[in-house]
C-alpha cells in the first residue's frame, strides 16, 4: 500500500515546526502559528433552551455535547498556541443590519420570521446586547481570543475576517460550531474561495434539520471544500506542538 501524502502548504524549512492531522480525504499538515480554530455562532440563540433556534422549533438536543467537544478543542488549541476566533451572529436592536423586505435575509432568516410570527419576541432574538446574542457561558472568549461580529451566514461577508487572518499569517482554519449546514458550511466555503485550508471537526458541530443534513455537509467539505477530522484527533495532534515549560 502506497504512503498517503498529506495536504497543506508548508515551506521546506518549516516542516519541523508542523504537525500532521489525520483527516479525510487525506491527512493535512498544519503549522500551529498559521492555524486558527474558528468558533461559529456558539450563542444562546443556537444552543440553549429558550434561544431563537429552540423557539423556532429546531431540535437542539445535540448542542450540549457539541459545547463539551468545542471546549475540549479550545483547551487544546490554546495550549498549543493556536489562535481562537469567535464568530458572533446578529444585528442592531432595530434590525437595520438584518435587511428589510428588499433583502433575501429578511425572507430566509428563521429568527426574523419567528419574530414576525410572534410579535412578543420582537427585539429579543439575535439583537446585540441581548441574552440570545451572547456567547454561551461554557465557551466564553479568553484573553488573546478574537471576536468577529457578523450579520449573515458567512463570517467573511462584510467583516474584517480576511484582514484579521492575513495580518497574522494564518492559512489554516479549523471550524467548529452551529449550524453545520448553515453558518459553518457557508464560512468554510468562503474560506476555500479565499485560498484558506479549511478543516471541519465533525463532532464539534451541530446541524439544524434532519440528521442527513449533517452528513451532507460532511460530504461536501470532504469532497469539495476542505477536510474533515475529529476532536480527539485534533487534540492529540496539536498537543505534539504545545509549548513546554523551560
Curated annotation (Swiss-Prot):
* Protein name stated in the entry: Ureidoacrylate amidohydrolase RutB
Superkingdom is Bacteria
Family recorded in the similarity comment: Belongs to the isochorismatase family. RutB subfamily.
What positions does UniProt annotate as the active site of this protein?
A: 41, 150, 183
Which SUPFAM superfamilies is this protein grouped with? Isochorismatase-like hydrolases (SSF52499)
- One Pfam family it belongs to: Isochorismatase
Query: Where is the chain membrane-spanning?
Result: none
Disulfide bond residue pairs = none
Q: Has keyword Hydrolase?
A: yes
**Gene designation per UniProt:** rutB
Describe the task this protein carries out.
Answer: Hydrolyzes ureidoacrylate to form aminoacrylate and carbamate. The carbamate hydrolyzes spontaneously, thereby releasing one of the nitrogen atoms of the pyrimidine ring as ammonia and one of its carbon atoms as CO2.
Report the record's Gene Ontology biological process terms.
nitrogen utilization; uracil catabolic process
